Amino acid sequence: MPPLSLLIKPASSGCNLKCTYCFYHSLSDNRNVKSYGIMRDEVLESMVKRVLNEANGHCSFAFQGGEPTLAGLEFFEKLMELQRKHNYKNLKIYNSLQTNGTLIDESWAKFLSENKFLVGLSMDGPKEIHNLNRKDCYGLDTFSKVERATELFKKYNVEFNILCVVTSNTARHVNKIYRYFKEKDFKFLQFINCLDPLYEEKGKYNYSLKPQDYTKFLKNLFDLWYEDFLNGNRVSIRYFDGLLETILLGRSSSCGMNGTCTCQFVVESDGSVYPCDFYVLDKWRLGNIQDMTMKELFETNKNHEFIKLSFKVHEECKKCKWFKLCKGGCRRCRDSKEDSALELNYYCQSYKEFFEYAFPRLINVSKTIK
């Protein structure tokens, strides 16, 4: 096998927060088993051993949730022990962690630093914006704990980026959010579209990100980012970086920006494997990593079916001048009805208006960094 990447759910759908917009919470509600609990040691070892045995060149283990730190620090210490034990091919191993940050303490920060984890920290902006949708299971605010996590990451030199979910509210306060992140010297930002529950009517929740709001958000954010770029204060925003990659290389390193799906090898805590984080459903279970090779999982009929469904290009996309840049977008934003063909991207008009607005300046940036 070539280099391998896994997205792992060590605590399944378990989480100590109850964010109003959590897509994985709504997804797990539609499975026969909502949560598989904490990953057992034997599942962890089977997974590590298999990946290190079958990968070539390098491999990556990305831990998400739910909230992966609920698995405990000892779980991750065991992970490092197993990676050392089974890495007889001396592969380059990359580890990453996406966390809400509320359980991060000195021990966690020290561990993440010493073991060179790249961390994605969920934070929606300053206190009043963050706390609106990101409360814990008791309905309490979480901002102070997340802010504390950023301080610990800086203290221990943990490499981290900020993951900000774009809702109807955050879209209206992009200036305030961007300025806050700048004040905190956060240089690596990901702004992630809020997702309505799969196969439900889009736009019906208070937090729902409607296309017109997303259009304004993208334009305002781009203006702020571009001004900083011209002033020599470059901030990495993943979506804009992905557009620049597409302009310069023809393809982005961000999965959802290439128009077609690949197998992400999402591993639930019981060892079950799925092709995509947005589709961890019984219907798309490929098998179990404990008793199938990565090649066998990849070559299942379900995986081929899942990938094939994303290849159909909408008729309107075929004649759109922005298709080479947009490529139709992420499948999840084109999928509105179960067992039906993919539709036009929910944010199609947003992207069209944004590209008209920003493309000349994107070209200018691409020429500068080429």
Where are these regions (language model features)?
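Cysteine-centered iron-sulfur cluster-binding motifs in ferredoxin-type domains/subunits
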Residues: 11-18, 67-70, 261, 317-319, ...
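Extended hydrophobic secondary-structure segments that form protein cores and membrane-embedded regions
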Residues: 6-9, 60-66, 94-99, 237-240
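Radical SAM/AdoMet-radical enzyme domain recognition
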Residues: 44-49, 53-62, 71-194
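Flexible mid-to-C-terminal extensions adjoining Fe-S/redox cofactors in radical SAM and related proteins
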Residues: 280-370
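Short glycine-enriched, charge-decorated loop/helix-capping segments at active-site entrances
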Residues: 33-38, 132-140, 205-208, 335
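Canonical Radical SAM [4Fe-4S] cluster-binding loop centered on the CxxxCxxC motif
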Residues: 2-42
